[in-house]
Structure formats: C-alpha cells, structure tokens
C-alpha cells in the first residue's frame, strides 16, 4: 500500500517516493519524521489536497496549530473522493501537543477532525488515549520508521575513529528538552574523561554565548553552527562515541533515530525510538549519566549496545516493518 502524507499549507515541497527513498545526497527532503512514512510505503508527501493523486486510497493528514481549518477542508474533499483519511499531530512532543490544543477553537476543530476521520495514527504511545478521547474511531500506533535496513543509509564510522560525546538536543528555552542540563553534564564528562564534546547551536548569538562561556574552561568543546544538511549532520554525529540527551518531551525520537543510522548508542531521552531501540525511559538522570560514562570507557559495553539496538531497530523500526504496519491502515 502506498501512503499519501498531506500537510496542508506546509512549507516542504511535494515529493513522490515511487522509486524508493534514494540515496542520502539526493537534493530532496530526508526520509525522517513523516517523510519516512511516505518513503517506506513508496508514496508521497504533499502540502495541498490538489496535489494528492485522485485515486489515492489512504491519506495521513498532519494537524498543526495553524492549519486546522485547511485540514478540515482537505479531509472533507478526500472523504468525498473515497479516500480513507487518518489524522495525526505533526508535532507530538508533550509541550507541542499542549500548545496545539491550548485554545478552545483549536480543540473543537481538532476534535471535529478526529471524529470525521477514519482513525488516528500516532508515533508515540502517549497520544493514543488523547486521539481516542477526541473522537478517533480507532487509533494506530506506528513508531517512526528509519532506513536502518537500507545499506546506503548506513552512516557508521569505524569504531577506532570515534571519540567523545555528541549532544543530541537543542532549544535552551524549552524546559522539557533539558538542553542546558544535558550540555552542562556532558561538559563535566568531557573534562573528566578528556574526550571531545560537540554541541549544535541553533539559537544564534544567544545560544553561542552560553556555549562559549562553557568552552572557556573546556577546549574540547566544539560548537557546530546549524543548520547543516541532514547527511552532513549525520557525518558529524557519527564521529562520536555516544549521543547524549536528557529530553523528557515524550517525542517520537528523531535524535535516537539519527543515532541508529550512525550505528551508535543514544543515552538519556524518553522518546519513542529511545524506548524501543535503546531501552531508555529518561526518568533517571543518574542512571543515564552512569550509562553514558560506561559507554565512553568500556569498548565491550559499547559494541553490545550497538548490536542490541540495531537488532531491535530491524525488528521494530525498519522501513520494511514500517511498510507492513502502514498496510494495516489500508485494511482497516
């Protein structure tokens, strides 16, 4: 079954994956987040209902704070065509969902969309009861797939060339990201273990000032100015031994998914991919801290963590498994 993913009014250009996901350096959107759903099913990602092929049988409709009215019009058009329409929150972190539904009008529109759909789809277990309570007749839980089963998306680096810590989070101002705490703890590990530390700066001058204040005491702290093209970002990540974060936002887990493509452990988050692939719950910072130190110093523990996470990813998160789970939407 091919899936059309529709993001009404979105900024990402239309893309069709009928020939597969392609290679990382193609000039197109990477197969991450909801593009991954389109890619693994050899479907398409669209920003206007007019672009969705007329005979599309199943559409995944992305709901955002600013597109709910457009989404409702699109849903009505698609249902009139005979398409099955499943709804989902485009941004599904706990703080993002609270922002989406923190207005009476938006909550009413969201509930109308849920009740008018064929069902809901969520990449996190935490949203299953919410979508059901808002009116979805059925809710499917499908973790975000990653192309761990496609050799061209293997960004691994030889173990002997890996060193240090890559901080996976950003956004100092979002409390549930715990980004500052993650950076400070990583800085301490870096100085104690004499290993490199890389942090992405996505917040311009303000973020740079915070990071530079830490770098004065730690010459091993490297500030990477964002944004980077996705393949280049992965090529930086894979030079390190672990990905470290303390994100408690209950997100789908893209950072952990990125770590899977780099064949490296991700420690400290409570996202869906963190939980499935790495056994993380993000609840105990002390345990995460000890685990990170172990993986930085114990080669056997590192290799075991990589082997186990890759096995779980192939079983539950691969493109092949994603396509199988999405086929259930067509049969629903």
Task: Please describe what each predicted stretch is.
Residues 1-80, 280-281, 324:
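N-terminal pre-catalytic "stem/leader" segment of glycosyltransferase-like enzymes
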Residues 21-23, 148-150, 158-216, 223-228:
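Conserved catalytic-core segment of nucleotide-activated headgroup transferases in glycan assembly
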Residues 40-118, 122-129:
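Extended catalytic core of nucleotide-activated donor transferases of GT-like folds
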Residues 126, 141-154:
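Short beta-strand->alpha-helix junction loop in the catalytic core
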Residues 177, 246-256, 269-278:
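Nucleotide-sugar-dependent
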Residues 235-251, 264:
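Acidic donor-binding loop of glycosyltransferase active sites
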Residues 283-287, 296-330:
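A charged, aromatic-enriched C-terminal amphipathic alpha-helix characteristic of glycosyltransferases
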